[in-house]
């Protein structure tokens, strides 16, 4: 999306980085905008951030409120740690209470001949302060005062004409339950919709949509956001086409020669690899091996774990001598536990994007099963993942994804959702039985960027190391899920149990 042709518009930044990115820099100045949303969706928080950003830029602001008292607004600001110096709060509830019972109508004729006392307070405050930014909170209370839809719309139209002549950028806040009020939406220069839903389990999910802004291009669709201490944090929907970049080809080796041989030399930057297999077969350990190898080569890695704590993830790798704790302390890697009940897919994509912008060149998602639970439906998982992988590929990032399959042995082993077509490399891990012992096998079934071995190798996670054995050609049933080994004991990796020669014991 090209925003260069719209650079001539002066913008009023909102103070919310993600929202300004969506709007291409902020709202065009000297216009009126409608912000719709349910109670608790964050409209007041957005309005305060909008005015505070103006103060930071040396502009004055007015907050005209009918829905909350001045003290309530100051309490909200204190909760976020915001000083309100430079913002004039116009408490219209006080003005309303001073009116007589027979003057509870807010008639504001376009000719500006007759004004209600409530509206006159706003006009007087604006003329006295001469602000660059104005917030009116909210239209729902004004609608009640007007009592008549025609008077109400005439009043909004007159306010629009007045504020346009006053060179103010105005936000009108309104509840989002007034469906079909297209006349109000048409009167404003832009419309911003806030939505929130409560899933069956977990925190509320919030998203926003720019319904319209006249004269500019903006990033369409829904964008996730959260309300945190410090204000709204918006995660723009990730669009890979907005971040074009040609990555330099390079291979990241695992540090295990046998594994690199299996993969035809290693995994390339700008590609994605899926580690597929049943629970406990070594997928996370294999992913940790690539993190350790990349960090040792001076590359920064970012790990997102959905299924276990960072402490356990790092601890397992430490016991295998990978040295991840040292890499973590040296800022060569980061690890974050993701709770799919709390973090939306858009927020997750935004977190990954920030890590990449800060230099991450290897990203691990462990696991896609947890990522899937963050999606309301399967098709959304595929769309989100497609866009995320396309973005990471353009940035030259190696993406390693873990997916656990259901079942342990035989034909019952299957994936909860087929995502293999999205990835460049698919590594299959399986259990097999040989000589009365359960062992693990690793093979590569897909590699887009080059050739790879067709054989199965043994994978062993034991003691203080991860090891990959030589080719085992005496296998059949790899793709059916019923992996059967028909060879002798000598090609297998030695185990560390018992005394003497373990291999001799097998024979």
Question: What are these model-predicted stretches?
Answer:
Residues 67-71, 79, 93-98, 140-142, ...:
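Conserved nucleotide-binding/hydrolysis micro-motifs of P-loop NTPases
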Residues 59-143, 299-379:
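Conserved inter-motif catalytic segment of the P-loop NTP-binding fold
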Residues 254, 259-280, 285-287, 331-338, ...:
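Flexible loop/N-cap segments at domain edges
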Residues 15-26, 256-266:
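Pre-Walker A adenine-sensing motif
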Residues 25-91, 262-324:
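Walker A/P-loop NTP-binding active-site region of P-loop NTPases
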Residues 285, 291, 302-305, 327, ...:
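Terminal-proximal interaction/regulatory segments of ATP-powered molecular machines
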Residues 33, 106-187, 191, 342-426, ...:
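P-loop NTPase motor core
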Residues 2-5, 9-10, 93-94, 98, ...:
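Conserved P-loop NTPase
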């Amino acid at each position: 999306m090209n925003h260069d042709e719209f650079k001539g518009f002066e913008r009023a930044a909102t103070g919310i980085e993600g929202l300004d990115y969506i709007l291409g820099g902020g709202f065009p100045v000297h216009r009126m905008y409608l912000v719709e949303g349910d109670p608790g969706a964050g409209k007041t928080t957005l309005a305060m951030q909008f005015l505070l950003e103006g103060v930071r830029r040396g502009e004055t602001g007015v907050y005209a409120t009918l829905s909350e008292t001045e003290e309530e607004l100051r309490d909200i600001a204190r909760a976020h740690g915001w000083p309100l110096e430079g913002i004039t709060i116009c408490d219209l509830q006080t003005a309303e209470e001073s009116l007589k019972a027979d003057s509870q109508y807010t008639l504001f004729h376009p000719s500006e001949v007759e004004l209600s006392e409530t509206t006159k307070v706003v006009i007087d405050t604006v003329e006295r302060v001469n602000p660059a930014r104005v917030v009116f909170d909210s239209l729902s209370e004004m609608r009640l005062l007007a009592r008549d839809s025609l008077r109400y719309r005439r009043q909004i139209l007159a306010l629009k004409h007045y504020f346009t002549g006053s060179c103010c950028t105005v936000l009108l806040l309104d509840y989002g339950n007034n469906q079909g009020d297209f006349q109000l939406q048409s009167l404003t220069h832009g419309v911003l919709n806030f939505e929130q839903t409560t899933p069956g389990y977990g925190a509320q999910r919030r998203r926003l949509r720019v319904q319209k802004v006249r004269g500019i291009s903006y990033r369409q669709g829904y964008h996730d956001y959260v309300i945190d201490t410090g204000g709204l944090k918006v995660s723009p929907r990730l669009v890979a086409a907005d971040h074009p970049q040609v990555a330099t080809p390079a291979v990241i080796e695992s540090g295990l020669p046998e594994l690199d041989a299996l993969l035809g030399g290693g995994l390339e930057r700008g590609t994605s690899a899926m580690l597929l297999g049943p629970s406990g077969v070594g997928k996370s350990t294999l992913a940790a091996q690539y993190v350790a190898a990349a960090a040792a080569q001076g590359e920064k890695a970012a790990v997102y774990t959905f299924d276990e704590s960072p402490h356990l993830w790092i601890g397992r790798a430490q016991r295998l001598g990978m040295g991840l704790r040292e890499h973590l302390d040296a800022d060569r890697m980061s690890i974050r536990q993701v709770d799919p009940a709390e973090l939306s897919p858009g927020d997750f994509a935004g977190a990954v994007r920030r890590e990449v912008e800060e230099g991450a060149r290897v990203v691990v998602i462990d696991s896609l099963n947890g990522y899937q639970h963050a999606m309301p439906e399967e098709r959304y998982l595929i769309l989100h993942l497609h866009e995320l992988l396309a973005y990471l590929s353009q940035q030259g990032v190696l993406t390693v994804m873990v997916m656990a399959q259901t079942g342990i042995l035989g034909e019952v082993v299957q994936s909860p959702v087929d995502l293999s077509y999205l990835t460049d490399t698919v590594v299959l891990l399986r259990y097999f039985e040989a000589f009365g012992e359960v062992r693990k096998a690793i093979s590569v079934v897909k590699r887009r960027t080059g050739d790879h071995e067709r054989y199965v190798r043994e994978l062993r996670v034991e003691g203080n190391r991860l090891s990959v054995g030589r080719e085992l050609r005496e296998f059949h049933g790899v793709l059916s899920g019923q992996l059967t080994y028909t060879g002798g004991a000598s090609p297998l990796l030695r185990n560390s149990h018992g005394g003497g020669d373990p291999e001799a014991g097998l024979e």
